[in-house]
Amino acid sequence: IIYPGTLWCGHGNVSSGPNELGRFKHTDACCRTHDMCPDVMSAGESKHGLTNTASHTRLSCDCDDTFYDCLKNSGDKISSYFVGKMYFNLIDTKCYKLEHPVTGCGERTEGRCLRYTVDKSKPKAYQWFDLRKY
């Protein structure tokens, strides 16, 4: 399913090429960049010492953070709002990044950790992290 007025926002894309964007160009450009993230983990794939047990692809936190910021700064306020709500709030997903071992959660909201506590005395390793709410 692709969000109306876009070619890249949803499962896959329906564009005829990498330069084609839908009516909501700003939102679509955010989705296109997100779709082209160089560090992704498909469902069932193992990478960086982690296994994606979700039924959908998960991305590096860098790519998800860039997507979040892009949507927030989009000129297409309504479409970016709905795409952001769908991806960050409705899909229960996580991202991964290289960080010192997580020891707990310093701040939590709506079941998601907003601020992690880490053990800086130990080496960094790839771990799963909750996405921010949109």
UniProtKB/Swiss-Prot annotation:
Q: What is the protein's given name?
A: Phospholipase A2
Disulfide bond residue pairs: 9-31, 30-70, 37-63, 61-95, 105-113
| Subcellular localization, as worded in the UniProt entry | Secreted
Task: Decide whether keyword Glycoprotein is in the record.
Answer: yes
Please list the tissues where expression of this protein has been recorded. Expressed by the venom gland.
Disulfide bond among keywords: yes
User: Which key words are in the record?
Assistant: Allergen, Calcium, Disulfide bond, Glycoprotein, Hydrolase, Lipid degradation, Lipid metabolism, Metal-binding, Secreted
- Can you name the source organism? Apis cerana cerana (Oriental honeybee)
Summarize the protein's role: PLA2 catalyzes the calcium-dependent hydrolysis of the 2-acyl groups in 3-sn-phosphoglycerides.
Record's GO cellular component terms: extracellular region
Q: Which domain of life is it from?
A: Eukaryota
Record-listed E.C. numbers: 3.1.1.4
The entry lists its GO molecular-function terms as:
metal ion binding; phospholipase A2 activity
Residues modified by carbohydrate are 13
- Which InterPro entries does the record cross-reference, listed alphabetically? PLipase_A2_dom, PLipase_A2_dom_sf, PLipase_A2_His_AS
How the cofactor is bound: the record states:
Binds 1 Ca(2+) ion.
Gene Ontology biological-process annotations? arachidonate secretion; lipid catabolic process; phospholipid metabolic process
Catalytic activity as recorded in UniProt = a 1,2-diacyl-sn-glycero-3-phosphocholine + H2O = a 1-acyl-sn-glycero-3-phosphocholine + a fatty acid + H(+)
Task: Please list the residues that make up the active site.
Answer: 34, 64
